[in-house]
Amino acid sequence: MFSIKPGPRNLPIDNPTLLSWNITDGDLNSKLNTLEYLNCITNIINSCGVYPQGLKDREIISTFHAEKVINDLLKNDYKISLSPDTTYRELNKAAQRSITAPDRIGERKTWVYQRDTMIERGDNSGVYQYGRAEHFTHIISDKPSPKDKYVAYAINIPDYELAADVYNINVTSPSGQQETFKILINLEHLRQTLERKSLTAVQKSQCEIITPKKPGEAILHAFNATYQQIRENMSEFARCHYGYIQIPPVTTFRADGPETPEEEKGYWFHAYQPEDLCTIHNPMGDLQDFIALVKDAKKFGIDIIPDYTFNFMGIGGSGKNDLDYPSADIRAKISKDIEGGIPGYWQGQVLIPFIKDPVTKERKQIHPEDIHLTAKDFEASKDNISKDEWENLHALKEKRLNGMPKTTPKSDQVIMLQNQYVREMRKYGVRGLRYDAAKHSKHEQIERSITPPLKNYNERLHNTNLFNPKYHKKAVMNYMEYLVTCQLDEQQMSSLLYERDDLSAIDFSLLMKTIKAFSFGGDLQTLASKPGSTISSIPSERRILININHDFPNNGNLFNDFLFNHQQDEQLAMAYIAALPFSRPLVYWDGQVLKSTTEIKNYDGSTRVGGEAWLNKGCSTYQQLYNEFHALYIDKAGIWSAFEGVSATKNVLAFSRGDSVNINHSPHDGLVIINKGNEEVEGTWPNKLQPGIYKNMGSNSVNIIINNTRKIIPPGKVFTLRGGTLNINIPGRSALLLGKTGEPPNYLYL
């Protein structure tokens, strides 16, 4: 067990009325004041994490004590400032938990098991040595495990600790001395607790919260990546201006079944063949890994968007002959693990601990080895959708897809599980979803499964008083993948968007239009924003824009028409969609955990698309700059295109961006020029730019003539403009995204 160490006594102790804390640990019996107690907590977290092995240590750093500490400091006129500790990474999986991970011993507590080495040694020394278990607060000595070599512990950690995380707490004494510690807290529960305390308005004002700003609004599709892979790169994703990360389905699935053909084992598509929504265990990670991912992302202001696979269940390899889920071999493995080796593990992977019984309406506990779906929860048809039925609504929404059985909205069990799944995700801090294969869902199923919709959530401003009632309203990023291949699809998707104003959608129609415009002989002017016309039927603020989707390269030649003809075209298309107002680009990254196609070749063996562009985590230099431009201009409505001259040809698309763009001849503060041709283009942009500090957020260096002087501006270069018209040289196969980042100093010009 970790030993409590009071630490140095040179802490900013000004007020003798600070609380005293009695700490007993073995031979150590110390009486510490609040600040010394904070030092002890900091030592434990730095040495062992927030779930150390010792029972006393875990109790000491609980959120309950943290709230008492902060209340005591504020009552004694100390100032405190709280900020997320972005350097802290909880590596012990016991740090994460289901709210009420169930076992057979009762509700509202989690029971975990630790191996009793005294029993293993066969002696009666009374010396217990336990390995790391789940998480716990105290021993229940009269509750033995039903397994011979384990001892049971009760976990009675409050639900609100689920969202607790490590924060830096900077303490300033009344005399001005400062010291920084670490503490485990849940901000919202802290505010509620302190509201009930007898603090004055002045004392409340001394508690400041510093929350991370959202790095951007672009979405990274972390396809085929483990939760740990994503965690390890979180700071880089923030640097590249991602505000959202879409992750693989968070369910129980496996990369092969007992009778899965060898040629199908280990492939990516198994992630879209769920075995269970109630538990989380798959090649990408388990429930603890997922919770750690959500917490780490929030430290950087990033939201996690899971892929929701509600339409179909897995086929369990070619040998699955029933509709019991999870499959029999999975249930058998879980039971064997529980009885024979790691009984606490599977209970800790339960995402949905309880649901209401569809018949009795009584609260029903979920056990990981039980059957959760049966034949009555699926559509009756056992036929697959045939090639000539893709415009048949009945077939699309009731038949199987490649053998996968279709869930039915007529089943109360299905709807309750899906609805509770959404609720549990929200409890973990998930602020959005991607609804997979929406064209196969009846509107009723979408309506019932993700209801009630969460349209907005309250987010604290970057630097605010803990008790400030004003919050920043943030929209939740809910969107659906509705693959549009015909007019019927377009109509059905539009109907869904009309019914659900909380949903956005991937704009497949604009993708096809963009592919055609960037192809050889295609006309970029078809993508220009012109008065009285729109480039898409989906409202701009509800569009998710893509240049590649995981389905396109991974289904043989089925989606070849959805692929660009050249890597450079795919990259230039990303510059275009990142520059549009209100919409969000979805950037593709293949983490290569399961087998997948990472490159499409031409007939001559050269790369058509993919390769490094799909494997670089969405963090190439050009993508970082595109995302930065997008974050700068997403909320600025103005867009104006040039309709004549060298800036308006089949190969060149140019448009201004900024708030004042609707007045065509007023100075603008953003400029986009895309040249898909091989030849460089030089010309004068007809609209003046505002004076200011500008940055080249495009893919290539450009030549700009200012005051009769030609300057080479490389990507990422910041420079100052007096304003006025620009003469610009744009290289072939390149994109210029010029954005104003600040006001110019009067004394410095390029």
From Swiss-Prot:
CDD domains: AmyAc_bac1_AmyA. It holds the Pfam family Alpha-amylase_C. InterPro entries: A-amylase/branching_C, Glyco_hydro_13_cat_dom, Glyco_hydro_b, Glycoside_hydrolase_SF. It comes from the Bacteria. GO terms for molecular function: alpha-amylase activity; cation binding. GO terms for biological process: carbohydrate metabolic process. This is Putative uncharacterized protein YgaQ. It comes from Escherichia coli (strain K12). The gene is ygaQ.
